[in-house]
């Protein structure tokens, strides 16, 4: 992972955006299917 020399903005971008999208998609999935 660290050998790719990625830009310093790419790591926090993935670290923040990916979990946000994952949580949002999961939330919408639960709301759509009424899984409570």
Curated annotation (Swiss-Prot):
The keyword Chloroplast applies. Coiled coil: none annotated. The keyword Nucleotide-binding does not apply. Its main location: plastid. InterPro entries: PSI_PsaI (IPR001302), PSI_PsaI_sf (IPR036357). It is a single-pass membrane protein. Keywords: Chloroplast, Membrane, Photosynthesis, Photosystem I, Plastid, Thylakoid, Transmembrane, Transmembrane helix. The chain crosses the membrane at residues 10-30. One of its GO terms (cellular component) is chloroplast thylakoid membrane. May help in the organization of the PsaL subunit. HAMAP family: PSI_PsaI (MF_00431). This is Photosystem I reaction center subunit VIII. It comes from Zea mays (Maize). The lineage of its organism: Eukaryota, Viridiplantae, Streptophyta, Embryophyta, Tracheophyta.
């Amino acid at each position: 992972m660290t050998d790719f020399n990625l830009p310093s903005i790419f790591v926090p971008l993935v670290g923040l955006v990916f979990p946000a999208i994952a949580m949002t998609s999961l939330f919408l999935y639960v709301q759509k299917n009424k899984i409570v």
